[in-house]
Amino acid sequence: MTDDADDLRPGAVRSTFVEPEIYYAGLAAAYVTAGALITDPAGRVLLVKPNYRDHWLLPGGAADDNEAPEAACARELEEEIGLALDVGPLLVVAWQPARAERFRPTVSFVFDAGILAGPERIRLQEDELDDHGFFAPEQAAARLGPIAARIPAALHARETRTPVYLPHA
C-alpha cells in the first residue's frame, strides 16, 4: 500500500493544513462601530443627529482598519463633538446582520464615557452632524430607530457594571 492509500482508511487522520492567508480570507468579516453613552447630571442621554441618516445616534462611529473599538470611540468623540473624553467600561455589544445597503454584519460596541456637566463644551463636526441634544432615556431610545434597545441596555449595564449583548440590535 502507498501512503496515499493509508490516508484513505476509515478513521485515518488527514492533514487539513491550509495556508494562513487562504484560511483567514475565508473567515467571517464584519464592520466594527463604537459609540459612547454620555449623560448629563440629570441622567439625560447625549445623542447626535447625522446629516446622512433619518435617526439620531450615540456619538461614535466606524473603526478604522485594525483599530481597537475603544480607540475608535475616543477618536470619533474628538472628531464628532470636539471632546477628548476617557472611554470607560464596555456596556453593550450589539450584532446586526448584513442588509442590502451593508453587505457585511456589524458588531457595535457601546462604552461608558461618563457624565458631562454642560453641553457648552460640545463642538459639532458640521460636515457630518446637524444637531445634538440631551434626552430623557425614553426619548433618546425613540430617536434611535432600529437600534433603540441600546439605550436601556447601556444604562442598565452602567448601573449593574455588567455588559449586555444585544443580537439583532
Please give the residue ranges for each predicted region:
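Nudix hydrolase/Nudix homology domain
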Residues: 54-55, 127-169
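A short coil-to-beta-strand element that immediately follows conserved catalytic motifs
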Residues: 84-93
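Short, well-ordered beta-strand micro-motif
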Residues: 38, 110-114, 133-136
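Conserved Nudix-box catalytic region and its N-terminal flanking loop in Nudix hydrolases
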Residues: 40-79
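Acidic, metal-coordinating catalytic segment for phosphate/diphosphate chemistry
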Residues: 2-35
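Short Gly/Pro-enriched turn/cap motifs at secondary-structure boundaries
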Residues: 25-28, 101, 124
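Active-site-adjacent beta-strand/loop module that shapes the phosphate/pyrophosphate-binding cleft
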Residues: 96-121, 154-155
